[in-house]
Amino acid sequence: MPGMNRDHTDHTARRFNHALRYLHAHYNSDSLDLHRLAEEAALSPWHWHRLYRSLMGETPYETIKWMRLHRAAWLLRNSDASVATIARHCGYRGNVQSFNRTFRAAYGLNPQDYRARIHREYPLTIDTQPPIAIAYLPHADDYLFLSNTFNRLKIHLHLRGQYCRTLRAFSIHLPEALRGECGVAFALPPENICAPLLTGTIAGGRYAVLHYHGPYADLDAVCEHLLHRRLPSLGEQAADAPVILEYLDDSHAAPQQQYRVNISVPLQPTPQEPV
């Protein structure tokens, strides 16, 4: 936070990230206890709850609920497990009705209808984009858990007075490994960026930009369709360069079915363009 000295800021960030790691490892567990989270941060429950809400814009309970529903949505689209099994895996043990109500409130559909719905085609444009300076962190986990690294990045910037809701947020992926290692980033100039953050640039150039609208749990399937079906049908090919996802909404401030994401795929030069 503004006014903290560097040592105090780093100490607070370490404690907060320690608690976040515990939350991310146990969010699906019956044994998760919000008092234990406070212990992991070496804070009283009152101070932990106050600090968490100040930095994250929501309560720990709201974060846990979002993570559980996000995992449930991904499992509904990417597994054959029954709704009851998915509900148990996502913290709704023995209470499928409660899971159905909560899921519908977040996604606008009950779990069965969400699983059965057909992917739609989204608007696509091709344009030239300028380079963008970024501050980023690497993400070595599955894409499903991308929010974990975004939270770490957000906390680091927040404690240094460098975060605001208008910052452009990105994830950066190798085109053939959308579920593998990647980076998460905010658009920031390199000045005053310090460890553990890294600085870099999203390359400018010619991109196909798909304007996606819907839950994050569908993004990997939408990207695969764009890369391997839609672009070839337009006579375009992806360049051997990272795919960029720009997140246009605060994930905890908008309904999950209303999220907007621009998926930007760098394109190979056309015959008329210089290589």
Predicted segment positions?
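Short, Lys/Arg-enriched, Trp-marked, Pro/Gly-tolerant hinge/linker segments that flank
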Residues: 1-18, 55-59, 65-66
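Basic, low-complexity segments
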Residues: 2-6, 35-55
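A generic structural signal for short
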Residues: 8, 22-23, 71, 142
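Basic, amphipathic alpha-helical hairpins
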Residues: 18-32, 52, 73-82, 103
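Short, charged low-complexity linear motifs
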Residues: 30-38, 83-88
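A solvent-exposed interaction/effector surface
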Residues: 42, 46-49, 58, 62-66, ...
